[in-house]
Amino acid sequence: MVNLKKAVCVISGGMDSALAAYKAKNSGYEIVALHFDYNQRTMNKERECFNLICDDLDVEKRFILDVGFIAQIGGNALTDKTLNIPKDGISENIPITYVPFRNGIFLSIAAALAQKEGCEAIYIGVVEEDSSGYPDCTEQFINSINKAINLGTADNNIVIKTPLVHLSKGDIVKEASSLKVPLELTWSCYENSEFACGTCDSCRLRLKGFKEAKLSDKIPYKS
């Protein structure tokens, strides 16, 4: 049976974007997978996880795009190794791991790809409720950039779907488990590629999710 609807899925290699992609597939979309290399610390590991997730989803069309200019802009600890990754818990302020306007850049490129590939939707795994407080992960931001994208594209009908935006990390892990998303193929650590540090914001949020879901995380952590 020919699949009549297609979606660009922005897949970082982390568990949130992985779940969003599985939800897209379960909603009947043919996936066009999109991944970005921006010279982040765990770039090679994230790319590896992206391909493993795509393999599990049987995704044929994959795009890995070099957006290294993000590292040239700098101003964040994910690309600038002279800046330390915070290890003192989730802050009320926007942390130095925030990459300025990253999702705005990613979604603009995803919109161009969606138009070229004839996709009616873009799936992205942003989480507002249980996160590090990045301003480009909010529902308000997504709705606003969706309007801008449709003003700037020919058909004006691309929908950005954020199925995780109001979920807690515990809910994300539970739902991923129920959908048989292989979370052991995903990576969250900001700092390391072999053994997750367990103490950066992203690791803390991931571990919090598994604890709330009463499940064990199968990826390796520093002992």
From Swiss-Prot:
Pfam families per UniProt: QueC (PF06508)
Gene3D superfamilies: HUPs (3.40.50.620)
Highest taxon listed in the record's lineage: Bacteria
Molecular-function GO terms, alphabetical: ATP binding; ligase activity, forming carbon-nitrogen bonds; zinc ion binding
Residues given in the record as ATP binding sites: I11, S12, G13, G14, M15, D16, S17, A18, L19, A20, A21
Catalyzed chemical reaction(s): 7-carboxy-7-deazaguanine + NH4(+) + ATP = 7-cyano-7-deazaguanine + ADP + phosphate + H2O + H(+)
CC cofactor: Zn(2+)
UniProt pathway: Purine metabolism; 7-cyano-7-deazaguanine biosynthesis
Family membership: Belongs to the QueC family.
Name assigned to this protein: 7-cyano-7-deazaguanine synthase
Organism of derivation: Campylobacter fetus subsp. fetus (strain 82-40)
Higher taxonomy: Bacteria, Pseudomonadati, Campylobacterota, Epsilonproteobacteria, Campylobacterales
